[in-house]
Amino acid sequence: MLKTINPTQTQAWNALTAHFESAQDMDLKDLFAQDAARFDKFSARFGSDILVDYSKNLINEETLKHLFALAKETELSAAIKAMFSGEAINQTEGRAVLHTALRNRSNQPVLVDGEDVMPAVNAVLEKMKSFTDRVIGGEWKGYTGKAITDIVNIGIGGSDLGPYMVTEALAPYKNHLNLHFVSNVDGTHIVETLKKVDPETTLFLIASKTFTTQETMTNAHTARDWFLATAGDQAHVAKHFAALSTNAPAVSEFGIDTDNMFEFWDWVGGRYSLWSAIGLSIALAVGYDNFIELLEGAHEMDNHFVSTELESNIPVILALIGIWYNNFHGAESEAILPYDQYMHRFAAYFQQGNMESNGKYVDRNGNPVTYQTGPIIWGEPGTNGQHAFYQLIHQGTKLIPCDFIAPAVSHNPAGDHHQKLMSNFFAQTEALAFGKNEETVKAELVKAGKNAEEVAAIAPFKVFEGNRPTNSILVKQITPRTLGNLIAMYEHKIFVQGVIWNIFSFDQWGVELGKQLANQILPELADGSEISSHDSSTNGLINAFKAFKA
């Protein structure tokens, strides 16, 4: 079990509070000027393909000393061991947390309730390999004897965000199959997708552990009805639908052959499920071997996380720096900014990963916390973001720590595109860190021919204060393996922060109330009768909706 230590009651927290009084005046220009080796001291390499530069943060050696002390005092190392050893650290649901077992390429035993889960994990992987080989190779035929050309993954949350993010990030490795993802219960999503595919050559993956998820099953039934409108015979469903689920009776009743049902386990959380059978769409998109490379990459980061001392542990360092901003500097959000168009859903994926994990106000003792927990996560690819929201990051009143991610080698080395992209990547972190003072601004204006009055009028608006913190994560190239490294790195960062904040990171009770109320409201929308059973606002909205529809 995880310890229940209030971080604010630790000696390290008190030391950080005292340290912050002087640290508020830290200036990155001074920190770099005072230490020519700062980059070397505050950067880390992961293997030969990833460099993490955290030198442009508002930290010094004393800051890190206290942060590592906080990690030790909250018994982080014991928590890491507890997770990897299969303890039921998801205590509110009584479950182990073992997405790491899904990518345990060492195949060393991982025990849950005394039973090694690896034989079951490997059996599902073998089943996925056989299935993907048949579909990709054209051996799997539709009801008219044609090979499959399109895959439609129907899921929501972790059953959609992860596979979609990865298949987009690994698009350069894509084979001939066309991938489509449907998640929203808004009928527009499924209807627009079905316009693009042919029932004779489309395979649907229904991703729902329970096979009862409202949004997923609504879309699944619509897809089946659309398919049968052409195929006619219910028996043909088995050739065009597969299930990522554990509910065999419901899968069979839907018309899916349970031989084409791919299982996963209750110790796999939805937002960590891309490593499981939920990743079948990934394997179909890029091939089984590349899917295994993705798992290998994540396993490499798992090994680093488990075996590396805290002071050199990349996910731990990133997590602690995040706590420094969240709990001491008062930062409310973090931006993830990948300078790679293929990674355009990476921030959205970790928006769920972080905010669903650590968006909690009750600690592991069951008491409301008296400190900040999970940050708001957001971001877009560069350079698009530069022309959208970087203005606020540079000159706004909010402190927004940013992670900049970029590959050194592009999959599309067209002309000088990548050099221009990377020049912006390097320039932005430099500009955020060091800014431009008023003296420099005025000198530039004078050089541009402005008179003294014009200089005085415009100069204040062109000043960049700098001192905006960033991490730079430079990757040799985005490959299945390095993408696996990156995803696991962020997963473990989230876990570390949850441990230190004394919250449960692997449940998500906050999604339940809205579902319950929606189920109560749904039958009230069936006719035109006036509703009065809710508060005046909800009643008014429902009745206005009915009036608009009438």
Swiss-Prot record:
Reaction(s) the record says it catalyses: alpha-D-glucose 6-phosphate = beta-D-fructose 6-phosphate
SUPFAM superfamilies (alphabetical): SIS domain
The record's Gene3D superfamilies line, in alphabetical order, gives: 1.10.1390.10, Glucose-6-phosphate isomerase like protein, domain 1
**A GO molecular-function annotation:** glucose-6-phosphate isomerase activity
Pfam families in the cross-refs: PGI (PF00342)
- GO cellular component annotations, sorted alphabetically? cytosol
What UniProt keywords apply to this chain's record, in alphabetical order?
Cytoplasm, Gluconeogenesis, Glycolysis, Isomerase
Tell me, in one coarse class, where this protein mainly resides: cytoplasm
Annotated GO biological processes are: gluconeogenesis; glucose 6-phosphate metabolic process; glycolytic process
Q: Where in the cell is it found?
A: Cytoplasm
- Give yes or no: UniProt keyword Cell membrane: no
The residue stretches assigned to a coiled coil in this entry are none
Q: In which pathway does it act?
A: Carbohydrate biosynthesis; gluconeogenesis; Carbohydrate degradation; glycolysis; D-glyceraldehyde 3-phosphate and glycerone phosphate from D-glucose: step 2/4
Q: Which residues form the active site?
A: 356, 387, 515
Q: What is its EC number?
A: 5.3.1.9
Q: Which family does it belong to?
A: Belongs to the GPI family.
Quote the NCBIfam families the UniProt record gives: PRK00179.1
- Its protein name is Glucose-6-phosphate isomerase
